[in-house]
A protein has these predicted regions:
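Short, hydrophobic/aromatic alpha-helical segments in well-folded domains
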Residues: 172, 282, 321, 338-339
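Nucleotide-sugar donor-binding catalytic core of glycosyltransferases
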Residues: 2-44, 49-307
Length: 365
């Protein structure tokens, strides 16, 4: 089959990343689509799952198994557990992820138990939280930095971890790529192959519009865990004491509305969901709109260089570094200019997608 005649379906991901990826594939000459186009999935020669493994159940739903299964590529954006996950912590993690009636009893009986058996949901939550607390305690003993990771985030991470192992052991994933080295190292440590390719810039993330920057500091995201809310509350008070306003927007903000908002923003605050990994989304959307990213300290920022592409500090020092960059326009603009050139030039999505397909032996370009 001619490489350019490949039909590639892109499964849903966060922040329209699936639309960006599909558009990049079309620009590279491939026939690509997302669920929005309502095309028959059986037409696909390749399926790319962006973000995590949760969506892989559609292979079973559409009976895309055996000889009918297309090539499956996983491009992991969301975090997996840290590399130093101990054997005991791994047992707690997998036990917590399996506290699910459908997993324990099968889909049909599990749904019945979950829906109709009194206190089934409450019992599941109690058992699961016990395992998650044990996991958190074990990992905090290994690294005190993990102590701030909320139980909610541990829950998401361990579900992702269990699904990944299940699908890999079933042979349902042909190629694995990660957007950070931390995830790649964890997967290799499990005995599977993975390669690091960062997610790249697409115009949907944003563009420079030349607006007056009248928003000092912006945090864009959900305050759906206790730690994040605690950090925001403290920062709000510290910045207000210095005459700086922190704007927090929790609702979804997409496309042009988000781009306009970021073009009015001087500093975009990045708070980590987990201490050992980070997502690329805030970096790409902020840098492409000329806003300075000020982040909690990232263990492995990789391609993004602190002091060159963004600023970082310990959580307790965030207010201080924010005030420093607000007072020094030239220093802030030096970093935002460098960051803009980096993401819109070197980190183009089409370039990274082409590299990904080449490593899957699906493209020679």
């Amino acid at each position: 089959m001619n490489e350019k005649s490949l039909r590639i379906y892109v499964s849903s991901g966060p922040l329209d990343m699936h639309e960006m990826l599909s558009d990049a594939l079309v620009k590279l000459g491939f026939d690509s689509w997302t669920e929005k186009e309502n095309r028959d999935l059986n037409q696909a020669d390749v399926i790319i799952f962006i973000s995590d493994t949760v969506g892989l159940n559609l292979l079973e739903r559409y009976n895309l198994v055996g000889s009918r299964r297309p090539i499956v590529i996983l491009w992991l954006v969301d975090p997996l557990p840290p590399l130093d996950l101990s054997e005991r912590a791994s047992r707690y993690a997998l036990s917590a992820s399996k506290v699910n009636w459908q997993y324990l009893c099968g889909n049909v009986l599990g749904r019945f138990v979950h829906k109709y058996v009194p206190f089934a949901r409450e019992l599941r939550s109690i058992i699961r939280s016990v395992y998650l607390r044990r996991l958190a305690k074990e990992m905090t003993l290994r690294n005190p930095a993990y102590g701030d990771c909320p139980t909610r985030e541990w829950g998401r991470v361990v579900r992702r971890y269990r699904l990944f192992i299940d699908y890999m052991n079933q042979g349902l994933i042909d190629y694995v790529f990660t957007t950070t080295v931390a995830k790649k190292e964890f997967i290799i440590n499990l005995g599977f192959h993975a390669e690091f390719i960062p997610f790249g810039y697409h115009s949907i993330f944003g563009q420079l519009q030349g607006h007056k920057r009248d928003i000092d500091v912006l945090f864009l995201g959900r305050l759906n865990n206790e730690r994040r809310r605690r950090v925001i509350d403290r920062l709000f008070d510290e910045l207000q004491a210095n005459g700086v306003e922190l704007m927090v927007i929790e609702r979804d903000y997409y496309s042009q509305g988000r781009t306009e908002l970021l073009n009015r923003t001087k500093i975009m605050l990045n708070l980590l969901r987990v201490p050992w990994d980070f997502g690329p989304e805030r970096f790409l959307m902020s840098m492409s709109c000329g806003a300075l990213v000020v982040s909690e300290k990232i263990m492995k920022p990789e391609l993004y260089q602190p002091g060159v592409h963004f600023a970082q500090a310990e959580t307790t020092e965030l207010a201080s570094i924010i005030c420093q960059y607000l007072k020094n326009d030239s220093e802030r603009e030096k970093i935002t200019h460098c960051a803009y050139k980096f993401v819109t030039g070197e980190l183009q999505l089409e370039k990274n997608v082409s590299q990904l397909l080449k490593r899957c032996h699906l493209s020679d370009t």
